[in-house]
Amino acid sequence: MSEIVIVGGSIEGLILSILCGKEHNVTLIDIHPEIGFPCVIPGWVERRENLEKYLDDEEIAHLKFLQNPNGFALRGEWLFKILTIKAAQLGVRILLRCRVTKVEESSQQTTISTIGGNNTRDGIIICDKMFDLTEYTAPAPGKLQHTMIDSPIQYASKQSFHHWGGIALSSEQQNTTVEPKLQLMRDDGLCEFWYDQKPTWQPKTGWIEQMQNTIPKALEEMSIDNSIVYAESLFESLNH
């Protein structure tokens, strides 16, 4: 049984923690007060079965899937809550408001220095493997950042894409003058509109919520399915 540390409570980080938590001791570090808040990703699943294998029937029902032409819409913030609970039930240690201040690697282990966390104390975590998934998370409060290491393999810089999303009444889709790159009709009478940048168009009733992110994925690749596939590939890498 290995000691695994995952930095970043993204969908990728949560799925990876659930997979690793069945076989290893896992610590999930997130700089936010609550994982998935604010939610800055589309609530978009292309194929339900990709997510259903991680959730039970009651959890699936709670997400209130609604079919769209490009898959299914769901409440992204609810998914974060459900996956966080599942990770905790598997024994994953979750450190919130926790910032990595230093990472030192040797041939046999990685030493991670942190500040904050559940006990609001500085700490040292020694692990066999660390995954840095901070690129997939929302911007940190107060512009706080982790201090990570630069590795030519796992931590190499990727191309970043900026996305802007807005939530409005579903009826507003008839009034759009700027075609969104991604549109998701939700079960709650609301609709997610996603663009590469904030549109000049404004809903007549205004934006109920606005979201922004900068991550290494184009908008067309931001389905929850792709996040799951990436997490699964990282988990498989532990065995190679």
Predicted regions and their residues:
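Hydrophobic beta-strand segments of well-ordered beta-sheets in folded domains
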Residues: E3-V5, H24-T27, D128-F131, T205-Q210
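Fold-independent oxyanion-binding glycine-rich loops
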Residues: G9, I31, L133-T134
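Glycine-rich nucleotide phosphate-binding loop and flanking beta-alpha elements
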Residues: G13, I35, T137-P139
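N-terminal FAD cofactor-binding segment of flavoenzymes
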Residues: I15-Q67, E77-W78
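Short beta-strand to alpha-helix junction loop
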Residues: L66-K86
